[in-house]
Amino acid sequence: MNIEFSQHAWEEFNFWVQTDPTVTERICELIDEISHNPFKGTGKPEPLKFSLQGYWSRRITGEHRLVYKVEGKNGVDQTCFIIQCRFHYDD
């Protein structure tokens, strides 16, 4: 699976790299898990609704969520598009 960050999500990820190694590690673990099983596992994966329909979220912490969308066929042709990794998707 390929992993792609939106510009916004990449900036958020770099914020964590600079400020909190524990959260950075958690995000990396979630991304690794998503690459093997996008819709099940830790972080309580849940499909989002309304304007984010088609996207999923996983809990990074009590406050922060990883928001992503998976497209393509299983395996090498799949891509995970990460659009957020800081704050809650309603914020």
Language model features: what each stretch is:
Residues 2, 15-24, 59-65, 69-91:
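Enriched for short, Lys/Arg-rich terminal
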Residues 11, 25, 29-32:
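Generic recognition of well-ordered alpha-helical segments
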Residues 29, 49-52, 68-72:
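Short alpha-helical linear motifs
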Residues 31, 35-37, 86-91:
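A short, hydrophobic secondary-structure junction motif
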Residues 32-58:
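A short, surface-exposed loop/turn module that caps and links secondary-structure elements
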